[in-house]
UniProtKB/Swiss-Prot annotation:
Signal peptide: none annotated. It comes from Saccharomyces cerevisiae (strain ATCC 204508 / S288c). It is an enzyme of class 2 (transferase). This is Sterol 24-C-methyltransferase ERG6. Its EC number is 2.1.1.41. The keyword Phosphoprotein applies. GO terms for biological process: ergosterol biosynthetic process; methylation. One of its GO terms (molecular function) is sterol 24-C-methyltransferase activity.
């Protein structure tokens, strides 16, 4: 199937699943308004790639089907993410007394600062979700943002929110595959990605595309999901944690940190910063919202978010969604989605506590001033 045909089919399926009025409803209300048969199909499309197998053949199948797997994943989980987490789908560090919303915004501000984003810059957000980070970074810096996403539902929601918050003049969101970007070479002043390029079947492929569209002298900053130096691919317990993260987060394969670092260098980037922000002695761990440990709750404003994302809250949501599904209020397959997300939470907490996994490996890389875009190399890397 050609890229054009795939995009048309995905757009048509999104309309069947979500309807035409996307944006006004969020969370569980959006879930309840989905087309039942289309939701069932979306869940089946996603789960067929995760059948409990962790062998090389199963891994290769997921890597080959990354585009459809990622599109299907966000069709089924976006409403749950907004319900439990908000419009910025990423983790962050927490400081004593800091609210959840403040920590999320600070994490985004820090990336923008490290990337050197300035007022008037044209910036690419790779894997933009529903536009939460793009809106925050645009407000924080005064830059102009283009958000790239392969999920039609999220693009429609991102555009709706940009209009709602009077930011449409500062940003736009486009459909595309980050392994085959449609932008002209040397287009963007800066590029960033927040916990998104982990969906790539090959990091060198997406990084080479970013290198291609970034102007010479421009900066790319990313929070990457990787397995750390403590991870052993041959350790069954380690592999189980990685698989739980892959299953629940729509990731074809979790790569080791060295793979990411080498991929950046192989694409021609000068790596300026390589730092695991999760490797610290913070009193409050980055994964605390998933743990169910109430001692970490900072203030009353955090209680609602923490309850929804904690173990107890997730069990409550699963039970509620199961009842709603039986009553016909939620589309069939919804409870399977909550089960997959529960697997992800278990894996993320286990990976965080053991420091086998980090969701915030910060890389800041620069495209040399005298760089000539290696178009042929870029094409080879995506294959």
């Amino acid at each position: 199937m050609s890229e054009t045909e795939l995009r048309k089919r995905q757009a048509q399926f999104t309309r069947e699943l979500h309807g035409d009025d996307i944006g006004k409803k969020t969370g569980l209300s959006a879930l309840m308004s989905k087309n039942n048969s289309a939701q069932k199909e979306a869940v089946q499309k996603y789960l067929r790639n995760w059948d409990g197998r962790t062998d090389k053949d199963a891994e290769e199948r997921r890597l080959e089907d990354y585009n459809e797997a990622t599109h299907s994943y966000y069709n089924v989980v976006t409403d749950f993410y907004e319900y439990g987490w908000g419009s910025s789908f990423h983790f962050s560090r927490f400081y004593k007394g800091e609210s959840f919303a403040a920590s999320i915004a600070r994490h985004e501000h820090y990336l923008a600062y490290k990337a050197g984003i300035q007022r008037g810059d044209l910036v690419l957000d790779v894997g933009c979700g529903v536009g939460g980070p793009a809106r925050e970074i645009a407000r924080f810096t005064g830059c102009n943002v283009i958000g790239l996403n392969n999920n039609d539902y999220q693009i429609a929601k991102a555009k709706y929110y940009a209009k709602k918050y009077n930011l449409s003049d500062q940003m736009d969101f486009v459909k595309g595959d980050f392994m085959k970007m449609d932008f002209e070479e040397n287009t963007f002043d800066k590029v960033y990605a927040i916990e998104a390029t982990c969906h790539a079947p090959k990091l060198e492929g997406v990084y080479s595309e970013i290198y291609k569209v970034l102007k010479p002298g421009g900066t790319f900053a990313v929070y990457e999901w990787v397995m750390t130096d403590k991870y052993d691919e041959n350790n069954p317990e380690h592999r189980k944690i990685a698989y739980e993260i892959e299953l629940g987060d729509g990731i074809p394969k979790m790569f080791h940190v060295d793979v990411a670092r080498k991929a950046l260098k192989n694409c021609g980037f000068e790596v300026l910063v390589s730092e695991d922000l999760a490797d610290n002695d913070d009193e409050i761990p980055w994964y605390y919202p998933l743990t169910g440990e109430w001692k970490y709750v900072q203030n009353l404003a955090n209680l609602a978010t923490f309850f929804r994302t904690s173990y107890l809250g997730r069990q409550f949501t699963t039970a509620m969604v199961t009842v709603m599904e039986k009553l016909g209020l939620a589309p069939e397959g919804s409870k399977e989605v909550t089960a997959a997300l529960e697997n992800a939470a278990v894996g993320l907490v286990a990976g965080g506590k053991s420091k086998l996994f980090t969701p915030m490996m910060l890389f800041v890389a620069r495209k040399p001033e005298n760089a000539e875009t290696p178009s042929q190399t870029s094409q080879e890397a995506t294959q």
